[in-house]
Amino acid sequence: TGDVIDFIHILGSVLDLGVPSDSTVSLAKLTATGTKDATTFLRGDNSFAVPSGGKIGQVLQSHKIDQFSTTNGIGGTGFTDITGLSQAITPSATSSKILIIANIYISSSGTGSRQYYRIEKGGTAIGLPSAMSSGTAVFGSNYNWHSTTSTVMMSLVYLDSPSTTSATTYNISTTHNGNDGDATVRINFQANSGNGVNDDNGTSNITLMEVLA
């Protein structure tokens, strides 16, 4: 008990026990249970398994480098789509989720005004708060309290379940509360001019990631 056989003599000759050389053992020779192929991996309990969910299937991005502005307020026609901040994606399975990440470089020319932002899918706002007795349902907002020269990067993040394999378009829309006579929402440039040596211009983007089930 506990002894190890190093070799065996048969009629005066050493019997080779057949220790396999490197990289010569096939999957079929392994005792592990489960399906053995390129889609599985060997676990510590000697079984093959399919990797769990959470894999990223595809990543798409729309990067907006030009300027955009709108004077549309909630007292007017409401929300306006920000040109260039939209991206389409075609999910590979109905069980997939879409992670939406939007970074918007914003400013407003109206001191004391508030800008509102929404994420839309196919033209319909998503991720909004539950029913409200008053007020405006938004995904994100910014209050321009300082001056017409203030800028900020607004980030919107949402995990959507489109339940489709058809092409789906997501976009960002904006409006303002109209508290200032010149409450213009500006995207990618500073409100006062955006062209001086001390004025800052920026870029915005919307990124879509398909998260596989």
What is each residue range found by the language model?
Residues 2-69, 213:
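Glycine-rich, low-complexity segments
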Residues 14, 26, 32, 84, ...:
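Generic preference for well-ordered secondary structure
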Residues 23, 35, 55, 80-82, ...:
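Short, surface-exposed loop/turn motifs at beta-strand boundaries within globular domains
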Residues 47, 76, 81:
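Short, flexible micro-motifs
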Residues 56-57, 81-84, 126-128:
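Local beta-strand/beta-hairpin segments that build beta-sheet-rich folds
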Residues 71-78, 88-97, 101-167, 171-213:
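Terminal beta-strand-rich extracellular "head" domains
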